[in-house]
A protein has these predicted regions:
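Charged, low-complexity intrinsically disordered segments
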Residues: 7-158
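Short, Lys/Arg-enriched N-terminal segments with co-localized hydrophobic residues
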Residues: 1-7
Length: 158
């Protein structure tokens, strides 16, 4: 019976939704220390310590090296993949003086204005975005992957 529940918990049909990471129990466990770090930024003294030396402050947390590097790069898509909760990751943006709208835009490869206009117009089209493998704009191959991704992209020829 316990094994049956374990197997059911591994069956995640929602993993086929492109551009979406569901913050479930597995993600929560994976990102526990990352999310605790984010919560610490709710205190002014901790924000100041983080801004004074980000790496030193991050090293006080039992986060994985990959999580720390994602925070340092402000690669929020990677932070989410590593268990970060978007509502807690917003504390990093607030510490940087960014609005949630600016953060969300950066995660989609849009400017703040483009993101705002898309949301006002009703969000992304479901066409091409219903399941992984289609060719819509929410598909993983069309998403920015942070500064490391941008740096690895070939430069357009003149």
């Amino acid at each position: 019976f316990v094994l049956g529940r374990l197997i059911m918990s591994l069956d995640k049909p929602y993993l086929d939704v492109p551009g979406t990471t569901i913050f479930d129990a597995e993600q929560s466990r994976k990102g526990y220390h990352l999310n605790q770090f984010c919560m610490s930024l709710m205190t002014a003294a901790n924000r100041e310590r983080f801004k004074a030396d980000e790496r030193v402050y991050l090293d006080e947390w039992a986060m994985t090296e990959e999580q720390k590097l994602a925070v340092l790069a402000r690669d929020l898509n990677r932070c989410i993949a590593l268990g970060g909760n978007i509502y807690l990751l917003a504390k990093i943006g607030a510490t940087d003086g960014k609005s949630f709208q600016q953060m969300a835009g950066s995660m989609t490869g849009m400017t703040e204005e483009e993101y705002r206009n898309m949301m006002i117009a009703g969000g992304r089209s479901v066409e091409g975005n219903r399941v992984v493998g289609e060719d819509g704009d929410a598909q993983a191959h069309r998403q920015p992957q942070g500064s490391a991704h941008a740096a690895s992209q070939p430069k357009a020829s003149a």
